[in-house]
């Protein structure tokens, strides 16, 4: 198996949003494929569940893979194939197994099986194994599990895993209507596509002995198996789409950079062998080995992901940062009228914001004061900054000082001017500037105040200081 070019496969079902766990599996498979010039990453869409499949989910899979850098134009990429297109081959193999005596027909109902076993949790008892039933209505095809055993799965991550045949029932491989079950279709497709490595989540480990038996029954050498550790939340519960934020698209829509997501997902269960954490995928590929993947559960820590993302944002040059922010600035995501947005103003403020945000969507709250007609109303910030004896007095004095036509409207002179006002009020600059910041930007936290005043302009600053004073006076009446 190791003499052949690596052929990995990623086989998602188009039945929902693209899960971060699936993203990690795809990346691990992609990394293996990239390690050899002839290595292949095969994308197979397992679309046999017609009732749940939707075309937009398939499109979403392709978009998500592309965002992760798994590009269908890359020579290492093969597919996408669709499992439904191989239905005839699945039936053909099922019939072959029957002819060879490796499978048999069974007409037992679920109720009959449970009645014989006396326990609904016990599996099939092999009742039809030697009855010699022919194909017919109501007769499913079961694989004849060999007596003896065990089946040994050599897992690259978990080591040697034994499955006693007494615990493996003669499992159904085709329904009574002839349609194959997933366990058979999956193996047939892997054989047909010459897959050498099956790298997937540990929830599939229980199916592996059945699939290995099928590989062997078809006269094929089983692939390299590797079952990845489960991904858990902060409560150490398996990530669930009903409870946790698990859709890759949700993270990207929030402003997590694809390269940061790739970096973080690659480290869920694997590490490069040293203390490095922030590193590009291209440097991870030659270091990646399945044997180095941890079998213990991997904690999806969004706080750590945010920290990773912040590092990647700060590493962007200013031009690229501006481009990456564009989706949040000029669309329905922006809270200001489109005509208010000034690209030159944003380019000027971008370096100040770039060092402060962890996800791109946060850019809006840092720069909205520049493009809104009035600053946002944040009552908590207002109450904190506009203390009696400070708020009104500081705003009045600041407005008077900022109205001086001889005051140069740049950050440094503005800071010096406000320091003078603060000293006259007997206040330190930090406490003195809070009312001005809230009056002008609406928030107690944000970009450097004096650069913000410079960009906003003299007339708009004066207008907002007056409006804040009027609000204070109205509240005191």
Curated annotation (Swiss-Prot):
Residues the record lists as binding Zn(2+): 106, 108, 128, 130
PROSITE patterns linked to this entry: AA_TRNA_LIGASE_I
Keyword set includes Protein biosynthesis: yes
One GO location term (cellular component): cytosol
Cofactor: Zn(2+)
'KMSKS' region (motif): residue ranges: 238-242
SUPFAM superfamilies: An anticodon-binding domain of class I aminoacyl-tRNA synthetases, Nucleotidylyl transferase
Highest taxon, organism lineage: Bacteria
Protein name per Swiss-Prot or TrEMBL: Glutamate--tRNA ligase
Organism annotation: Thermobifida fusca (strain YX)
Taxonomic classification: Bacteria, Bacillati, Actinomycetota, Actinomycetes, Streptosporangiales
């Amino acid at each position: 198996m190791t003499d052949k070019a690596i052929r990995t496969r990623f086989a998602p079902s188009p039945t929902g949003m693209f899960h971060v766990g699936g993203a990690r599996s795809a990346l691990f498979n992609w990394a293996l494929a990239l390690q050899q010039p002839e290595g292949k990453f095969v994308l197979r869409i397992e679309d046999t569940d017609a009732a749940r499949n939707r075309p937009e989910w398939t499109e979403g899979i392709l978009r998500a893979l592309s965002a992760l850098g798994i590009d269908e134009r890359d020579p290492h990429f093969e597919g996408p194939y669709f499992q439904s297109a191989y239905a005839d081959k699945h039936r053909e193999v099922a019939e072959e197994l029957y002819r060879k005596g490796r499978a048999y027909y069974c007409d037992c109902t679920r109720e009959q099986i449970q009645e014989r076993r006396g326990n609904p949790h016990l599996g099939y008892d092999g009742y039809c194994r030697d009855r010699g039933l022919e194909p017919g209505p109501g007769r499913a095809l079961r694989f004849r599990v060999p007596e003896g055993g065990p089946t040994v799965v050599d897992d690259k991550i978990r080591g040697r895993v034994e499955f006693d045949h007494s615990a493996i029932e003669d499992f159904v491989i085709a329904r009574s209507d002839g349609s194959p079950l997933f366990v058979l279709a999956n193996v047939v497709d892997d054989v047909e596509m010459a897959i050498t490595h099956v790298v997937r989540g540990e929830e599939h480990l229980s199916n592996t002995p059945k699939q290995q038996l099928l590989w062997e029954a078809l006269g094929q050498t089983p692939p390299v198996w590797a079952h990845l550790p489960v991904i858990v939340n902060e409560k150490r519960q398996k990530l669930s789409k009903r409870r946790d934020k698990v859709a890759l698209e949700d993270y990207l829509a929030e402003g997590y950079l694809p390269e940061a997501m790739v970096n973080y997902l690659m480290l869920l269960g694997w590490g490069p062998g040293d203390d490095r954490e922030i590193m590009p995928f291209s440097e991870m590929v030659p270091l990646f080995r399945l044997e180095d993947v941890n079998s213990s559960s991997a904690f999806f820590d969004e706080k750590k992901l945010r920290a990773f993302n912040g590092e990647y944002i700060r590493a962007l040059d200013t031009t690229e940062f501006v481009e990456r922010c564009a989706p949040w600035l000029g669309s329905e995501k922006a809270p200001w009228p489109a005509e208010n947005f000034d690209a030159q103003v944003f380019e000027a403020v971008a370096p100040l914001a770039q060092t402060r945000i962890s996800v791109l969507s946060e850019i809006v709250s840092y720069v909205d004061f520049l493009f809104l007609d009035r600053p946002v109303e944040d009552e908590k910030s207002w109450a904190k900054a506009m203390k009696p004896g400070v708020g009104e007095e500081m705003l009045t004095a600041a407005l008077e000082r900022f109205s001086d036509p001889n005051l140069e409207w740049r950050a440094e002179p503005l800071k010096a001017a406000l320091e003078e006002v603060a000293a006259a009020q007997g206040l330190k600059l930090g406490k003195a500037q809070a009312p001005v910041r809230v009056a002008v930007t609406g928030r107690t936290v944000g970009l450097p105040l004096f650069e913000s005043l410079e960009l906003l302009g003299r007339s708009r600053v004066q207008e907002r200081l007056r409006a804040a004073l009027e609000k204070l006076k109205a509240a005191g009446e």
